[in-house]
A protein has these predicted regions:
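Non-heme Fe(II)-dependent double-stranded beta-helix
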Residues: 2-53, 60-178
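Non-heme Fe(II)/2-oxoglutarate
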Residues: 3-8, 12-34, 81, 219-221, ...
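Extracellular structured ligand-interaction cores
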Residues: 56, 143, 169, 184-190, ...
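Short, solvent-exposed loop/turn segments at secondary-structure junctions
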Residues: 63-66, 147-148, 196-198, 210-211, ...
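Active-site rim elements
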Residues: 113-119, 176-178, 227-239, 258-261
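Secondary-structure boundary elements
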Residues: 131-140, 179-183, 192-200, 212
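Short, structured patches in soluble enzyme cores that scaffold and shape functional sites
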Residues: 145, 150, 174-176, 187, ...
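Double-stranded beta-helix
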Residues: 183-186, 196-256
Length: 357
């Protein structure tokens, strides 16, 4: 989880969003209580009401199914796996660390800047969906990866990862500290590259806990786990939203969620991780690191779990992705004010002083 910082940057949006890291934000009004000032672009009124009540929403066909298929094919190719030969999915390999081993078990694909990933990021319908939930269009896109999860057996068996009694649990957790007095705002998302089926596992969540969170929280002990909920799953059912290839699922960071294992015989679950957050154009070091990552195909450094491919780094495989006008703004290459972000005199937001309380 990000460590709270005293000095925050304000996003260049009408709604005041503040953040030190571009992952979690302080806002005057929580997203679940936000009153829309902009007309909805993609979500219906019912979609938006569901999002605010239950903490997630599925947006149909934000990219064509054919584009999702190309991303799936790329995920296979990037890892040197043959979709028709399951024995290639479990070949022995060396690991750089325990984290590297866990990421392999969970199915992470260490590619961040291929053109196909950027095509999804700069798709207008994807941006419009995140505009709807944040109620602002001045957003940055996350520089994240893919996931290709074969059946969790052999050297991908989750039993190889020691279970813990507290803290992170892959099957159900929060990605923010839910014991804070002022809860941080965070939005996450995935684009399905395969249709969901129960045996494939994949994204699952607890929408009823989100809906009743304030009442539930008031009854919990002061020393409860901040990121692992202890719940009765009959009272708070865990569900797996249905998705088709090309659909986008957006979820609130305060929605308890996780990933169920793949228990199928020989099928895979695949997604692209993709979210958008209010741009922090005054956070110059952050902006420059994002642009440099795109320019050089360097592994992003915004999260310690992003490792880059150990066998052949993506910077050695293909060239820089082309960006359209929207993509340049979503990266931070161009300011949402219309100025070139290379110009250090350009008005690109402001730095603010605020406190977490």
């Amino acid at each position: 989880m990000p460590t709270p910082a005293r000095y925050l940057h304000r996003a260049p949006s009408d709604i005041p969003y503040f953040s030190s890291d571009g992952e979690t934000y302080l806002a005057q009004t929580p997203l679940r209580d936000l009153k829309k000032s902009r007309p909805l672009r993609v979500l219906s009124e019912d979609d938006f009401a569901f999002w605010q009540s239950y903490g997630y929403v599925v947006v149909k066909q934000v990219i064509p199914a054919a584009s999702a298929r190309r991303l799936l094919d790329f995920a296979w190719e990037f890892q040197g796996l043959d979709p028709d030969r399951p024995e290639t999915w479990y070949e022995e390999r060396e690991y750089r660390s325990d984290l590297d081993r866990e990421l392999h078990i969970y199915g992470f694909v260490e590619a961040y800047h291929h053109q196909l990933l950027w095509d999804s990021r700069q798709a207008r319908r994807v941006h419009d969906a995140f505009v709807d939930v944040w109620d602002c269009e001045e957003l940055w896109v996350t520089l994240d990866r893919l996931n290709l999860n074969p059946p969790n057996i052999k050297n991908r068996d989750r039993a190889l990862i020691p279970r813990t009694e507290e803290g992170f649990d892959i099957e159900l957790h929060w990605d923010v500290d839910t014991t804070l007095g002022v809860l941080p705002q965070r939005v996450q998302g995935i684009i399905a590259l395969t249709d969901t089926r129960p045996e494939l596992g994949g994204f699952q969540c607890c929408p009823e806990l989100f809906r009743r969170f304030d009442r539930w929280k008031a009854l919990q002990p002061d020393d409860r786990d901040p990121i692992r909920p202890r719940i009765d799953r009959h009272e708070f059912p865990v569900v797996r939203p249905e998705m088709e290839a090309g659909d986008l699922l957006i979820f609130n960071g305060l929605l308890a969620h996780g990933v169920a294992p793949n228990t199928s015989e020989s099928s895979v679950r695949a997604v692209q991780y993709l979210s958008m957050m209010p741009a922090l154009e005054s956070a110059e070091a952050l902006r420059r690191s994002r642009v440099e990552s795109w320019r050089t195909l360097g592994t992003p450094d915004w999260n310690a779990t992003l490792l880059g491919d150990a066998t052949r780094h993506e910077s050695l495989r293909y060239g820089r992705a082309d960006l359209n006008e929207l993509g340049a703004r979503l990266l931070g290459l161009t300011s949402w004010s219309g100025a070139d972000a290379h110009d250090e005199t350009a008005p690109v937001g402001e730095e603010s002083c605020a406190e977490f309380v």
